[in-house]
């Protein structure tokens, strides 16, 4: 199924966190990452924390296709805002999984 030109591309990001850092990670994420990502043109679709498993899952999107997402991602990765957000930060993510995903059921849909 190919997306329509006006569709958005969503990237799912899943992190296994270093034990004991979840609260610090969440504070940093809210204060630094969300503002930098949104300033670069991304939409944060959702973010969930699993305290018991010390995992964090979130998604960002960009209007358009995967090429548009990749182009904006490269701009973000090279941005001063991202560099500042990560400057001096300890390692909090032990393992990450990042992939582009497709919508199967729209948020708020009822089965």
What is the predicted role of each segment?
Residues 9-14, 25, 37, 56-61:
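Short, structured motif recognition centered on aromatic/hydrophobic residues
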Residues 4-5, 27-46, 61-99:
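An amphipathic, aromatic/His-enriched active-site/gating alpha helix that lines ligand/cofactor pockets
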Residues 1-7, 106-111:
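Basic/polar N-terminal segments that are highly enriched at the extreme N-terminus
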